[in-house]
Amino acid sequence: MLALSLLALGLLAEVAPASCQQGLGNLQPWMQGLIAVAVFLVLVAIAFAVNHFWCQEEQEPGSTMMITGNKADGVLVGMDGRYSSMASGFRSSEHKNAFENVLEEEGRVRSTPM
């Protein structure tokens, strides 16, 4: 078996290399650069799309909008009695338009080191 593999290796070493690829001509350097930039931008767009769909976070049930019973209490035009349920969690008891500063849970806070 060793002799057969050595014979095949020797034959492959003696055979002249094949030149199978004959191009129609070399592209101009500016055309090569343009093609390289286009391919790079396509790859970046694909990476952004994959990142967007792959790393998409599920919406928390507490962050959805809820409808209240009284439409006359609507604050914003176009909201028609809707409010964010997140705002009701830290609304102040002292004044109806004041809010408390609530500490966030450690796992939910995103921060970047400087």
Swiss-Prot record:
Parts of the chain on the Extracellular side: 1-28
Membrane among keywords: yes
Keyword Cell membrane among record annotations: yes
Topological type in the membrane: Single-pass membrane protein
Transmembrane domains' residue ranges: 29-51
Cytoplasmic side: 52-114
Phosphoserine: modified positions: S85
Record's subunit section: Forms a heterodimer (via N-terminal transmembrane helix) with SLC5A2/SGLT2 (via TM13); this interaction enhances SLC5A2 transporter activity. Interacts with PDZK1.
Record's protein name: PDZK1-interacting protein 1
